Structure formats: C-alpha cells, structure tokens
Regions:
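Short, surface-exposed beta-strand-loop junctions and turns on beta-sheet-rich folds
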Residues: 1, 62-64, 138-140, 252-256
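A contiguous strand-loop segment
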Residues: 1-73, 106, 284-285, 290
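Structural recognition of the beta-strand scaffold that forms the well-ordered cores
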Residues: 55-58, 122-124, 132, 238
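Short helix/loop capping segments that flank catalytic or ligand/cofactor-binding pockets
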Residues: 59, 65-67, 131-134, 141-145, ...
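Proteins synthesized as precursors that undergo proteolytic processing into mature forms
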Residues: 72-109, 202-211, 216
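Catalytic cofactor-binding cores of redox enzymes
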Residues: 101-140
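C-terminus-biased signal that marks the final domain/tail of proteins
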Residues: 107-109, 116-117, 126, 149-306
C-alpha cells in the first residue's frame, strides 16, 4: 500500500450482532465463530482466520466494479465483507454456496486516503480448498478449487491465470519475470509455492511460505509514479490452519509474532480483545498474553454515522 494503513489486530468472540450497513436494508447476522483479524485503517477487516481455520484476505483490485443499475438488494459494506465470511462459515464450499446466491450488494465507499475501495477476496480452509471472489461489472465471479493457491492484485483473476499459463510453458527453472508488477509476482509465487517443501510440519511449512511471500513482496519505500498501483508491502501474515496459529510480520518491526487461537477464549462472555500495532510496540513469539480488552473499531460505510 502507498501509505501506512494503521493496522491493528483484534479478537472477536462468537455471538456479536452485526449489520452490513448503518441504515435500513442491511444484511444482519450474529457471529457463529470467533476470529483473529487484522484491520485496515481501523475501519474494516482486511485479513484474518476464524476458530474453524477459515482464512479470508482482502486485497486491492482496480478492475473491481460493484454497482448494478437500480440495485435494491440488501447492503453489505466492503469494510465488513471479510468479517461476514469469518463470522459465518467454517469451510470455503459452505461460504461459496451462500455467496454465489448474490443476495446482497456491496457498498464500497472511498477509503480515508481518498482511494477507491476496489478490492477482491480470497478464502481458504483447512482442507486446502480456496476461492477467489471478484466483483466484475456488478456480478460476482468465483474461482473455487485447491489449484488456486495464489492471489495478488491486478489484473482480474482469469487474466492472471492466462498469464501464468504462458510462463508455465517457459518453465520457472529457466526464467521468471522479476518486476514488482502484481502479474509478475503472481507468476513467481505460483512457481515457488510448488518448489518449496510440501510438508505438514509447521516448523518447515511456515518459514517456507514466508520465504515465498518475502520473495514476492514489494520493497519498502519504493515509488513508481508512472505505475501508481505498485506500492510497498506493509505486512505479511501466515495462517497455520491445521494448528490454528495466526502469524504476523510487519515490515516496520524486526520480529515475527503469532497468536495461537487454541489459547484464546472465543465465548461471547470473553469480549473483544486488541493487540495494538500502531504505537511502535514490538512483539515476539506468542502474543496472546499481550491482548487487551477493547471496544471494536467502527466499520466504514457510505453513509456517515449521525
């Protein structure tokens, strides 16, 4: 991202009553599952894992188009879309079966810095099943399957797959595209994710995946005025869905830390917890002990709260 998105980590318990919008005609639900999430600007959920091992990650996609002319369906704010998935579903297939009904429309206000909220969502579960969800011309496009292991940014996913097929023919051991463009990073990640050790041992798997993520990250502080959609990587997360551990690494701190979901009380009585990241505090190892009682952040919707 082109600036610090002021991320913090929150723990949400089960039983929270939510609405997808702050006026009438909103999607409403009560969270079935607790989750550990990372925010963007503290106005929305952009990444996280729930207690069932479902992971959801929201990334920039400038080609996104959410609007349909004359659309009167109930409203889901893009700021809370990721949280809706984490709150309600245990598996990718379960989520896809509901989301493909397209029973709501996405409300996508501009972000605090004025950027458009053009985003797409990836979800994975502990079986390895994955879905990439993109709104194109007002309609939801879904790619579901274990073969979809990488998502970056532009272009739209079907175009990414076509570009990757071209590079598969060349072969990654001979040459890989090396720029910071998201399509090149997609190709490199697609090659390396199959080249690293394929093991259930988290002590090997987690650092192996992190090594791929570091390889395809955009260096901190890079500026490309002629390519405004290329921006620095701000942080990386890895979700160990088998052992229910959420790892987090900020480019501004020297340490990897994690939250072991098995040690967290997600019952409704436990309340909301927060791990502040914007105050310069450095964490290392299991940071469950550093969680503090907290109010929730306020999700951003198109209509300001009066």
């Amino acid at each position: 991202w082109k600036e610090d998105i002021m991320s913090n980590i929150y723990v949400f318990p089960r039983g929270i009553q939510r609405a997808g919008y702050n006026k009438e005609n909103a999607v409403k639900w009560t969270s079935k599952y607790g989750s550990v999430i990372a925010t963007g600007y503290d106005i929305g959920t952009c990444d996280g894992m729930n207690e069932k091992g479902l992971v959801a990650s929201l990334l920039f996609l400038p080609e996104s188009v959410f609007d349909r002319q004359g659309d009167t369906r109930p409203v889901m704010g893009i700021s809370i879309w990721t949280q809706y998935v984490l709150d309600n579903f245990a598996t990718v297939h379960e989520a896809v079966e509901e989301l493909k009904k397209e029973s709501f429309r996405i409300d996508a206000p501009h972000m605090p810095n004025g950027s458009a909220s053009t985003l797409h969502l990836a979800i994975t579960d502990e079986t390895g099943n994955t879905a990439v969800l993109e709104y194109l011309d007002g309609n939801l496009s879904i790619h579901e399957g274990k073969e979809f292991q990488v998502m970056t940014n532009s272009p739209r996913y079907d175009y990414q797959l076509a570009i990757n097929d071209y590079w598969k023919e060349i072969g990654g051991l001979q040459m890989l595209p090396g720029t910071n463009r998201s399509s090149d990073r997609f190709v490199r990640a697609s090659f390396y994710i199959h080249a690293i050790p394929q093991t259930p041992d988290a002590k090997i798997a987690v650092p192996s995946v992190l090594s791929v993520m570091r390889n395809v990250s955009v260096p901190f502080g890079i500026t490309t005025p002629d390519k405004p959609h290329i921006s620095s990587t701000r942080w990386r997360s890895v979700s160990d869905q088998k052992n229910k551990i959420y790892y987090f690494e900020s480019v501004m701190t020297p340490n990897l830390f994690w939250l072991d979901l098995k040690k967290i009380d997600f019952s409704p009585k436990a309340g909301i917890k927060k791990l502040p990241l914007t105050n310069g505090k450095i964490y290392a190892g299991d940071a469950v002990k550093d969680l503090k009682d907290s109010d929730s952040f306020v999700f951003l919707f198109q209509t300001p709260v009066m």
